[in-house]
Amino acid sequence: MTRPLTHALFVNSGILGQRTFARFIQNAFTGQQEGVRATQIVLTEGLTPAERVLRRVVCSRLWRDGWAGMTNLDFMRYRAEWNAGWLARKRIRQLEQSGARFDVLHFHRQATSYASLRRIRTTPTIISIDCTQRCAMQSARSRLEARTYAPNVRRDGDIFRAAQLIISTSRWAADCLRDEYPDCTTEIAIMPNPVQLDGFDPTWIEERYARATETPGYRPRVLFMGGDFRRKGGYDLLAAWRDGQLGQHASLDLVTSSPVESRFLSAGVAVHVGVAAHSPEWRALWRDADLFVLPTWDEAFGMVFQEAAAAGLPAIGTRINAVPEVINDGQSGLLVAPGASEPLIRALNQLIASAERRRDMGARARDFIVQSAHPDAYRRTLAAAIQRVANSTQPARTIR
């Protein structure tokens, strides 16, 4: 018996790592895969001049971050997330006007659904999250600053309660949601982000080991990738690199979209700006690296740690939020506290010193990511969830 075709609309914010998920959806559901026909909206694509102007106005900062030691007193986060939701609603209406019909809506992440609450209550909907507002609130430096996120917290709660299914990238995010919204009975499925494994060759692991053990005077290459250099712990890493004199026996490649102050650079450090994800240069940096480090202060999940694992690299990360769900401390990498310079120096020295340990940790990291984030398995699980949600209520309807 032929399985009925389920029409799904994916709405993606198109910012930062969300573009990677959009690329996955585009590839995974080309045509009709697993009984699902997919249409996708990426909000950063096809913006009109008027939409760009509106975004600039709505998302403009009225309170400079750091004034009086606080941020977000102008409710910048809520305005930006509402703008994403408004644009998503507009794009959905445009599809509706062309006669589009969908069985299921999939919003990635929750901000894209902010202006679609009524639609969620009438159309089976999946909300994909990697965190609640706790990520922002735990960085607040005062009670007043924490309260500025209250509108986001309330809107998130309304969305979560109305959805048919919530897909969380981690156990940590799922637990946060249950803790913060105890009255929310919506089912939560834990599904780590899929990783495009075909971009990372498993033979790199032995290739690195051979390079390190057969090259006289070999200097291991340490790789950092983080767009917001300061928030991702870039300056903490540079301080540790300098204080530990690590440049004497290793090199450090910094890949970032932020300017890096030259006065913090020391021996062995190279800065790479403007490297596009999945480009040949990006792939070469992963291949040539011997270990990965990101001593981040603010990370909900850390897709880049998944990419490091896919590349067969041991990773040094921080013991925050869902990062320990990706890095098995002592097995596939090492975890330190944010801002802890001496532990970071020790972790770097441990991995720089041993090609055998790097190889073994990298192999375990690769095995873990193949098991937990294989794109084919994710596609099958997501397709099954879409069909289950679609069949839990009435059949397809025109979006309203």
Where are the model-predicted features located?
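Membrane-proximal helix-turn-helix segments that form the acceptor-binding/catalytic region
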Residues: 146-166
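Carbohydrate-associated surface elements
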Residues: 172, 194
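Nucleotide-activated donor-binding/catalytic signature segment of Leloir-type glycosyltransferases, i.e.
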Residues: 256-287
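Conserved acidic donor-binding segment of nucleotide-sugar-dependent glycosyltransferases
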Residues: 329-330, 334-341, 350-356
